[in-house]
């Protein structure tokens, strides 16, 4: 067993906690959209085919924008990338809540805006930033904690959202989402990226962009 302290600095601990909260909020909300379908179908006349297309588009954009946010993380830091992602996520939810929620607006808000937001807030960026704060001996544990936090969000959020849908309706539930995403904007500022990753020499500090060029 390594004799190194698991939390090597206060900044590492804060980043670990903040990144965990980020993925709980992001993945927790994303996991629950399927619960809204019957309300969307009844109140907004969203068909199952349109709903399925938008969810697929959301996943596609999540994947497309993840490496782009990786470049932003390399250049400006994880806090900036995650903050931008939460802005897209929050604007998508607020526009939908405000009435831009049928036809093409449904595709734009839930599919495009939230899909882009997931590119930096879901799991890849928070995990990669946390990994840079820990040496190889503790890195797996640290990133595992963030991944576990995402799983916790997956598990808990459907239970809470289902209760909220029954008791308060889908509009109020989306309003609660916007409050959580607003919290995410604040928490994102604490996901700091070290100038030199722990355990990496300055001469060997390779960015994602450098790795792509080398490949």
Language-model features: locations:
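Intracellular juxtamembrane helix-capping segments at the cytosolic ends
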Residues: 120-134
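Helix-to-loop junctions at the C-terminal end of transmembrane segments
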Residues: 65-77
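Flexible cytoplasmic inter-helical loops of multi-pass small-molecule transporters
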Residues: 193-210
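Residue-level signature of mid-helix packing/kink "hotspots" within the transmembrane helices
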Residues: 31, 59-67, 154-155
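Extracytoplasmic
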Residues: 14-48, 66-69
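C-terminal ends and interior cores of transmembrane alpha-helices
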Residues: 87-101
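Hydrophobic core of transmembrane alpha-helices in multi-pass small-molecule transporters
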Residues: 104-121
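Helix-loop-helix hairpin linking two adjacent transmembrane segments in secondary transporters
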Residues: 146-196
